Every structure is written in structure tokens, then in C-alpha cells.
């Protein structure tokens, strides 16, 4: 993820609405997701393998690519404004795959519930989807789904076989067997 690249950082700043200004907040994430998702053109990778486009290149190409390119872009935009993100790679029951981004929202369930309520009001939806993860220190963390195929941030998750790997901006990765 090239979230420190000026193209990526500048684009992230352009996407945030004035009413969402201030310290990093969930409204900024929603602003970015909405605008990128609205302009996204899905285009497959070349035959014979995956191509992973850096966020700055995807921006320069006019927001075109496949699911992993969207995930890389959204995760990079989140990082560019001070958030924490990860990209999940999942396998489907039919052997296909999918990639999507998640944003860290909190380790405090009350705060998560409040953020989910705000998202539900913004998008007039009944449920907001997030995953949980148990950190090595025993702390439970909450991650909001930012999949391009969802109707809103926190939309339903991709149906996978349970084989999911989370990739972090610092190069770490781990297998995740739960949601």
C-alpha cells in the first residue's frame, strides 16, 4: 500500500466532506468509500494471474480494477488519513476468490455499537457487518467491512469457505478462521 504517496494522500483528502472534517472519524471513511464506490469500474486482471495495482496507479487510471485493486485503494486511503486497515483474501466454495478491505473501528464494544448505529442511520440499513479478532494480548478488536460489492460500509460479507488471510500494511499476515 502506498498510502504515503502524495497522489494517494491528496486523493484521500479530496474525498472527505467538509462536514466530516476534524480528527479521524468514521464519517471520513464513509465519505471516501461512497465516492470511490460510486466511480468504480470493475475490470478483470489479465489472464494467468493476479495483478495488484498500487493505490496511486489506480487513482491515476480513473478508479478501474478488480476487487483486490479496490481493496488496496480503500485500505490505502484509510491509512492516508490516520486509520488502520487490512485486506482480507477469501476463497469461495466454488474455488474462486475475493479480496476486500476492513477498517479497524475499536476494541470497545460500546463504541462499536455507537458507530454501527451511526452507519445504520446514514445508510438507512438494519444491520452493519464487522468482524472480530483476538489479538495476542487477549484484546478483542473490531473491523468494519469495506467491500466494494457491499451497498455501504459495513455491508454484508462475501460468502467464503472459511479460508481467509488478513494482510496488514506493515507486511504482516495471518490466517483467520472466524468472523
Where are these predicted regions, by residue range?
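A structural boundary/capping signal
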Residues: 1-179
